[in-house]
From Swiss-Prot:
Name the record gives this protein: tRNA (cytidine/uridine/adenosine-2'-O-)-methyltransferase TrmJ
Matches recorded under InterPro entries: Alpha/beta_knot_MTases, RNA_MeTrfase_TrmJ/LasT, SpoU_MeTrfase, tRNA_m1G_MTases_N
Coiled-coil regions listed: none
Catalytic activity: cytidine(32) in tRNA + S-adenosyl-L-methionine = 2'-O-methylcytidine(32) in tRNA + S-adenosyl-L-homocysteine + H(+); uridine(32) in tRNA + S-adenosyl-L-methionine = 2'-O-methyluridine(32) in tRNA + S-adenosyl-L-homocysteine + H(+); adenosine(32) in tRNA + S-adenosyl-L-methionine = 2'-O-methyladenosine(32) in tRNA + S-adenosyl-L-homocysteine + H(+)
GO molecular function, one term: tRNA (cytidine(32)/uridine(32)-2'-O)-methyltransferase activity
Phenotype of null mutants: Inactivation of the gene abolishes Cm, Um and Am formation in tRNA. Mutant has increased sensitivity to hydrogen peroxide (H(2)O(2)), with reduced expression of oxyR-recG, katB-ankB, and katE.
Gene3D superfamilies in the cross-refs: 1.10.8.590, 3.40.1280.10
Documented EC number(s): 2.1.1.-, 2.1.1.200
Keyword Transferase: yes
Top-level taxon: Bacteria
Any one GO biological process: tRNA nucleoside ribose methylation
Keywords: Cytoplasm, Methyltransferase, S-adenosyl-L-methionine, Transferase, tRNA processing
């Protein structure tokens, strides 16, 4: 199960931190490491800091974009230490672990995303995350080393996984009582939906592309905190398609007859 959690490091500048993150992952039973445009990898410092977790480094995927790194994920959790203009669902590490387990029990793929050592994740990158995770360190000295942050979250995930052995999760209970298809949408499917939604809002005159303000960011937050199933996504996409037909004066399926 833990092999469906990917640790995503974005634009890491120090290769030693990649090695330290790999060691933290292997300590806690995780194996998927994805690197988005690392400044220097592979590198001897990464191997040295991995301290025996070189199999994690050897299997690491290097990609050009965060979108590639998140492809196929049903939930994306991004670490953030800064206040943002638009509030977002914020979890502590323990809540993050619980959320991970619920999606794993639903056969989803999970991504834990960590930003640059000097600046973290950008606002645009954080908007690709359904949840933001904050490690409540001492505010007088709150900056954590990247590998240490990976260790904190992967430890909590492992503890939640151990505690859940033999016990039904909230997601399992939901599945046992629901008639709906509960296979969750992936991060890339959500991105396609957001693009479709934006085009539709422009078509009906609700969104001015010249003055978008924060509308799409707020809508991302709204949908991001919901566990949307593939069936529900099909319904939402169908509604948008029919709305676009009406806006463009085309024939559409529904009628009042």
């Amino acid at each position: 199960m833990l092999d469906r959690i990917r640790v995503v490091l974005v634009n890491t500048s120090h290769p030693g931190n990649i090695g330290g993150a790999a060691r933290a992952m292997k300590n806690m039973g995780l194996s998927q490491l994805v690197l988005v445009q690392p400044e220097s990898f592979p590198h001897g410092d990464a191997v040295a800091r991995a301290s025996g977790a070189t199999d994690i480094l050897d299997a690491a995927r290097v990609v050009d974009t965060l979108e590639e790194a998140l492809s196929g994920c049903s939930v994306v959790l991004g670490t953030s230490a800064r206040d943002r203009r638009i509030p977002w669902p914020l979890l502590d590490p323990r809540e993050c672990a619980t959320t991970c387990l619920e999606h794993l029990e639903a056969n989803g793929e999970v991504a834990l995303v960590f930003g640059r050592e000097y600046a973290g994740l950008t606002n645009e990158e954080l908007q690709r995350c359904q949840f933001h995770v904050h490690i409540p360190s001492d505010p007088e000295f709150g900056s954590l080393n990247l590998a240490a942050a990976v260790q904190v979250l992967t430890y909590e995930v492992r503890m939640a996984w151990l505690a859940a052995q033999g016990k039904p999760t909230k997601m399992e209970k939901f599945e046992s009582t629901s008639m709906l298809n509960t296979e969750l949408v992936t991060a890339d499917e959500l991105e396609l939906y957001y693009a479709h939604l934006e085009r539709t809002l422009i078509d009906i005159g609700f969104l001015d592309p010249e003055k978008p303000r924060h509308l799409m960011s707020r809508l991302r937050r709204l949908y991001g905190r919901s566990a949307i199933s593939k069936l529900e996504m099909n319904i939402l996409r169908g509604i948008l398609t029919e709305t676009q037909k009406v806006a463009r004066g085309l024939s559409y399926k529904r009628s009042d007859d």
